[in-house]
């Protein structure tokens, strides 16, 4: 789940006594003959995983090693150091009072202060009030998202707005379970080290210059994206550790002026590229699957969705991925242009990692099986969720994952809880006529302006995109607004498939607007390499550039494909 409210952020804590001790190697003529420490990710069931530099050498050690520690989420990135053993102050339990009052007030005001339209039933109006309070809670976060969603579905049952089976009907939804299983695949990539190995190979092949290094990281993310549906997992589990290790080895440290040598550019480029990687594949982000499910409930059905999604996204996403590192190289340039040591560092890291393990090969084979079934499964009667279930079963049977790994993947179970609540409410809003009534009102307003469907399409897409400044979750945005905006598009005469795909692609692209707009945003900003004003400035500039690329290139490509 790409939600800021539930994410820890990464900050640097060092125990070094000299700047040399923070590098992968000491600057000596014989440094390549020593084992270099490399990054490893340690995950546990505790809420505070740690990232550490470790050395696989049994005969050499560093007297002081850089230590990366996950800290609780802050509003700002800090460069100050603190002991890794310092315990955070105890957090206050229970709901936050002011966000709670505001969230509940939204629904109460609609229910009791706003006259019910004659076209709607009391049940529909009451469900809309509960839904709006639920959505307000997603934005204001009086409680964690899953807890607040549970309160929302409880309210719908207690008030007899929905019967229990109807309120919980979405918990059997195939798409939601596909999302849950995809989180387990992501854990497999991290646990086996396969994702880290893939990214390191691209650093070795393309890392002689800063620009080449950026392209290597961008390409590697695009390759692992279809099997890792969480941009947060990709950012925190694979790419941020690699970027930080490369930056530190080049003397680019977070917090100070040296960060501009390499770290700021790599962080910003990876951050801005991630949205296009997520938009490229249906299974590259959890919200993609939710978008298509909500579209289907409004009558927009796409045959062979995995293939069709990839075909439609391929050209605009490829152009955007190709241009993003180059554009940022001009607009947000690194001080260090050449990184001749990066391939050597990557080669040494691969040497320390050793040969590909059995579990990595199993992971490769399993993902090839799953992706093949996602592409061709419909022809042999295997649905996407069944393909994912088969893949997870293989990983469990062969010991790549154990059941505790699945149980400890809290984001998966949390996603199941609140996705199901939102999908269930959204489907009932459609069944009770709320969505059609709302979209009809907007469509009539647009028609009074004598707008053609392309003009209405542009206005609605822009509104859907930039309203994300009010959200801290991509999936929360989808659950709150996707159905309504899709219905408005359709009512305005926009072809259904075009509107559904464009809204879904935009959902990935606006994840880089701010430091709170997505899970990966919090991870990358929390690393301490970019200033907050730069995040907002470059976020807006790249949003306009991406919108232009997807509108021009995508518009022509979709016309060729016959989507409209």
From Swiss-Prot:
GO terms for molecular function: L-glutamate transmembrane transporter activity; malate transmembrane transporter activity; oxaloacetate transmembrane transporter activity. One of its GO terms (biological process) is malate transmembrane transport. It is a multi-pass membrane protein. It comes from the Eukaryota. The chain crosses the membrane at residues 94-114, 127-147, 166-186, 235-255, 262-282, 307-327, 356-376, 380-400, 415-435, 451-471, 484-504, 538-558. Residues 1-22 form a transit peptide. NCBIfam families: dass. Glutamate/malate translocator involved with DIT1 in primary ammonia assimilation and in the re-assimilation of ammonia generated by the photorespiratory pathway. Exports the end product of ammonia assimilation, glutamate, from plastids to the cytosol. The precursor for ammonia assimilation, 2-oxoglutarate, is imported from the cytosol by DIT1. This is Dicarboxylate transporter 2, chloroplastic.
